[in-house]
């Protein structure tokens, strides 16, 4: 396993980050424990979770994923060997059971304390804002959000948010901060406040979707990463499992995410399916696993710090982790780019 420095910090993180979103709903606590045991043994030292998890959300399951991690940490005593990232939920209709205030100093402080309790730790290495509380494009929204902009009641409180996060860092409860599901404008607003007042914490990472089916990060945010030293933590690198190839041919595997939750169709449109078929042909031609090829491609990008992989079975997890040793040939990369030119970003 290779390691990278988490941007602007002294933390070394594995190139693969263990995703946890299904623990507590699709996966039991024992299955989560098994995944953590295996990941740790493979040298993965970076785990990502959120107060919102598991997803799809249910009020009665709020925070259960963090609790599973906390129980494992208590059992194994390996907290100091790990880099733990979690997130505060934004304001949305599906988070009313968590809070309705968005990102406020009081809400942030309370959310951190609750996450610490569930994780059974006294510090969080990377604390992230899960999505913007303003109206903009994220979670698969596309095109110009004219009506959303017109009805947006958001008041710019980014200075206030950074000030509170700075206090939390000073207290030792969190170490570094990141954003998620953000736009170039949003990231630069946080950077602007830090540059205006250096005592405010600087954003270290952005956790956004990035995969062969969604390379929008390259259009605007990659330059922000390059010029401002912000690392990308790609999530959904296999597009809800679509790039595993298991849905090809119209298949609906029992227990698979899109089978269980048909509304999760972001990566399953007709053009995305054609692109997936084309990527699958490349993998077959070169004797590669489609998911391993898809994950290895992301590591070729200099702005990627660590790729978040989630799995509902040990078989999936092992195959994904094994991608860490795969180096793609120039021929494979060229073929991938050719497909991308034909089907650019079919699942934004």
Feature names for model-found ranges:
Residues 1-87, 106-109, 122, 170:
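N-terminal binding-site loop/beta-alpha segment at the start of enzyme catalytic domains
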Residues 15, 46, 123-126, 176, ...:
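Residues at the N-termini of beta-strands
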